[in-house]
Amino acid sequence: NDGNGRDSDPHDPGDWTTAGQCGLWQPARNSQHWTLV
């Protein structure tokens, strides 16, 4: 979402979308899955 693809910038907000951005009534999404170690 910062406009320059994948990079090492720690401030990069990722690839999240807001609710409705991908179609009416679609929930917000993020491809990152959290894992507890």
Curated annotation (Swiss-Prot):
It is found in: Secreted. It comes from the Bacteria. Keywords: Hydrolase, Protease, Secreted, Serine protease. One of its GO terms (cellular component) is extracellular region. Residues 1-37 are annotated as: Disordered. Disulfide bonds: none annotated. Belongs to the peptidase S8 family. This is Protease 2 large chain. It comes from Achromobacter lyticus.
